[in-house]
């Protein structure tokens, strides 16, 4: 039995997220179906994270234990031959037996993209969230300073039944504008359910003048979901990289 590591890109627009669900199209489900076909026995694919419905990935890391004589390149090519066009295995290689895509991950980089142009974005509309206002970049950057570091991010988690620790480390939040696109780059050791989208929604409320930068600090300290901002739509979010 060999342990294969994969780097996978996908357009999450038509999927119900990463995690397999009976009767629904998911990324994990599609990958497992192809590998099970290839091996002739059930194969479980372990992802570095579980992206939500409609969220994309440029470089999701995953691994799977398989009994096959195919080389990593042959496995990659087989998968890409039978996967839908909106999922692509960029890389396949052999990993150490103990490698686990989720538990060995040291950090993740997510980017949330907003469109702030004057006209509708035709060609990248599935990968951005369109804003009908010009957010205050400086105010959002000030607010982001309160959100970096090691904190209890319970206010920014959509799962009220979360029993495990909601303490996480967010190393950096970078907010930059390039022409008609506004990028929110988040790097951290791990993120809670919907956390990046709630952080983004909260920062956008600051940018729109609906709350002050200082209110973000109060929301963080409250450990109460109702004190943070709205959950930004899924299409603007993309997992860019997983660090090991």
Task: Give the ranges of each region predicted by the language model.
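Structured-RNA-binding interfaces characteristic of tRNA pseudouridine synthases
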Residues: 1-244
């Amino acid at each position: 039995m060999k342990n294969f590591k994969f780097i996978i890109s996908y357009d999450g627009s038509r999927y119900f997220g990463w995690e397999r669900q009976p009767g629904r199209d998911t990324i994990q489900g599609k990958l497992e179906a192809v590998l099970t076909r290839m091996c002739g026995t059930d194969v479980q694919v372990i992802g570095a994270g579980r992206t939500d419905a409609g969220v994309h990935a440029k470089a999701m890391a995953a691994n799977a234990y398989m009994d096959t004589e195919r080389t990593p390149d042959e496995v990659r090519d087989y998968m890409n031959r039978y996967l839908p066009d909106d999922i692509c295995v960029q890389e396949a290689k052999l990993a150490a037996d103990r490698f686990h895509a989720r538990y060995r991950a040291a950090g993740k980089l997510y980017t949330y993209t907003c469109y702030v142009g004057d006209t509708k974005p035709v060609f990248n509309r599935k990968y951005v969230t369109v804003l009908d206002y010009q957010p205050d970049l400086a105010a959002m950057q000030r607010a982001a300073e309160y959100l970096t570091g090691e904190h209890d991010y319970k206010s920014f988690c959509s799962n009220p039944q979360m029993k495990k620790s909601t303490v996480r480390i967010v190393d950096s939040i970078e907010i930059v504008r390039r022409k008609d696109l506004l990028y929110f780059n988040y790097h951290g050791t791990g993120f809670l359910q919907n956390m990046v989208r709630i952080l983004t929604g909260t920062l956008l409320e600051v940018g729109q003048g609906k709350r002050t930068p200082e209110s973000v600090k109060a929301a963080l300290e409250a450990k109460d979901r109702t004190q943070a901002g709205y959950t930004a739509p899924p299409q603007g979010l993309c997992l860019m990289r997983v660090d090991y």
